[in-house]
Amino acid sequence: MSAALRFWLRGQSAASNQSSKAPSAAPSPAASSTSLRDQFNKHGRSSTGSVSAAQQEASNIEDAMAAVALIMNDDIDGAEAMLRAREDASTFHQLGVGVSTFLRSILGFEKDIMNEATTRLGETETRAWNDMKKAQKEAEKHGVYGGSVYPQGHPSGGSHIYPPGSEFALVNAEAQLMGAVVAVMHESLTEGIKGFYKLRKAYATLDGIMASELLYLQTLEKKGIITNASSTKTSLDKMPGAFSDSEFATLENTKGANTPSQNGAAADSASVAKDPSGPQTPASASASNEAKTAADVDILDEKLGHLQLDADAASEQNVLPDASLEDTTPSTPQFSHLDQLNKFGADRSLFKSPVDIFVHSGASMCFGILLLIISMVPPAFSRLLSVIGFKGDRDRGVQMLWQSTKYDNVNGAMAGLVLLQYYNLFFGIADILPSELDIQQLSKPSTGGAKFEAVGYPHNECTALLAQMRHRYPDSRLWRLEEARVLANARRIEEALAMLADNNDSKMRQIAALNSFELSMNSIYALDFKAAPVHFLRCVELNSWSHALYYYLAACAELELYRDLFHSGEATSPAALKHKKLAEEYFRKAPTVAGKKRFMAKAMPFEVFVLRKLQKWEERVKAYGLDLADVICVSPAMEMIYLWNGSKRMPPHLLEKARTYLPWERCTAPADKDVVAKIKKLEQDEVAIGLLAESSFLRQLGKSVEARKLVEPLLGVDKSVFKGPTRDDYCGAAAHYEVAAVAWMEACSPEAWPSAPEEVESFRKQKTDECQLHLDKVSKWDGFVLDARFGMRVQAGIDSVKWLKSKKGWM
């Protein structure tokens, strides 16, 4: 669970330990509507006379949403200034301030900001709960139970879909979700446990909101209105797992903020949602202001034109036609606007009032994120999920996120960001994914009439989504970062590097740090070892997430530069000695800055990896009497490419070049001391590292037979060989994963199938079964340092195998 949360929130890297720069002077992005907001001055009071409570609430929602939208345009300071300018700030404004503080805390990972975020979110949680109870009492006073929050006769305001107080229940749930993330990322196990409890309560609240929405849509369907209600089905029959809320009473009582028990918040929201007292009435609508002109489409088409990959572009790069390469270089037809492609879920026109739009888009975004993240939790955490009572649903989670992107507000933007992270990052590290051919042939129409499978990559929709976000938030460097990830995942690594290098001027230091880390890792994948150290040292300046990792990677690059000069006959040249000195300096610096950041009271996995690695090498230094740089054998840079699955981003010529860095002859130990031969004999985990890395390079080149031959001998190595305080304990599990990936590649690549058509199905089933066999072994493997990183790749594989077997009837 922790790895999945970090993955989404950090995007494989850390961010700033400082706040953003000065707010932008550029105009803010448009909110979903300004008609009501314009009627109120900066103090929140009407400029035209008295207004109803419903209209005041609608204005508060729109004003707060418009302010928070500035964050998506790289202006977090401007957002806070706008939110704090209101003298009578509403719950929604308070939520906005909580969101900005939350983002600062998770990006910077500074303890004082995390504590501030915890306090602010706790206050928001309390106020939202109180406002929800107040709204429910107000509704009872006027005899309203299942329709509007406020009395009928205020068509421009309250909800005609959700139970009274649902908008505040949503704010309460959002505050709980953010508070849970901050708690889980705290360096305290107790705080982490409280965080999981908050997640459970938010889960129940959101499911209750979605249940009431489903009833509304079903009512419309009975009237003959097409709504796609089945796509909004509720999943909270009985949450699996069982524990009493009283078990957490002690934890709840230790809070600093005066937060009431939230049993009522979730229970009240869910119970009212599931027992409406009458038919739901659609809200009368104001005209939608989200229609886009043909000129807008042309502009977006031009801006994103270079992302429209086609088969010709792939062939120009000599990308081989194996399954893994096929999935990253699909054909994309002429650009279409997202509105024309996003047919998932209920029609946008069914939600018209500001309150309904806020609740629908927000609940879809929040619940979608929850369902998606829970579905991706590695197998090792399955017992934890059963205790907490969560049930993930990837298909539904992804569909709900696409539903939220239909709305031009910060909820839609956040949903879009999560979707792009899911497709660009999660798919980017996963090897075992359905082929394009299987997706096209086996996908079933969704309720919206479009082909939709959560295990597949919707290229057209993602391109359109990215275009829309860049158009909506033109000053943001966040969306250009995502665009660079799309290029990198298409093996256009040089273009990605150029875009990232030109994207380092974000007003938000946090986003600049994310961009810098992406640039650094892509430099390693591009084998640009001259640029990589500069970029990683820049990461040290920009953020404090894992300086140990940054120094280690900078050292890896310096080591390769030293080796290049050494083997070209310049071992004693000033340049070679400089790179050797820097490599040793950075390697030895890494352990001294490790352990400063912890996650739920545990050391960061890659920092533990670095500590073990340096301990191993220092033992060799003492044993053989050599310099640190000269006792390192298998390329640590190639090992890091393997562990981060960077080979998926590398075009064929770089994959072939990477193989030349793997021979043991690259080691610079004196030949007369026979050091390499001794290490080869004594340290089988070192041998395994080289075989695993080369196997992955061969697999990405489409050479499955050669890849299998390299890695299969590792399956027979006893597990104990890879155990020990300085052993690389991931090698045994990784060997099974590599065989699973090769088997899947053979199952999905037509080039590997038998020539006789009647034998294809049995061959594919056999290879799929083989893949599942090895994935199951990895999922049950004893714990190892990097098990969470492999666990996410394994979970993606398990889901893909399950999907194909289900579609083929092989279950």
From Swiss-Prot:
InterPro entries: Iml2/TPR_39. Residues 14-35 have a biased composition (Low complexity). Transmembrane segments: none annotated. Its main location: cytoplasm. It is found in: Cytoplasm; Nucleus. Residues 14-54, 253-292 are annotated as: Disordered. It comes from the Eukaryota. Keywords: Cytoplasm, Nucleus, Phosphoprotein. GO terms for cellular component: cytoplasm; nucleus. Residues 253-264, 278-291 have a biased composition (Polar residues). Inclusion body (IB) resident protein that interacts strongly with lipid droplet (LD) proteins. Involved in LD-mediated IB clearing after protein folding stress, probably by enabling access to the IBs of an LD-stored soluble sterol derivative that acts as a chaperone in inclusion clearing. Belongs to the IML2 family. Interacts with lipid droplet proteins. This is Inclusion body clearance protein iml2. It comes from Neurospora crassa (strain ATCC 24698 / 74-OR23-1A / CBS 708.71 / DSM 1257 / FGSC 987). The gene is iml2.
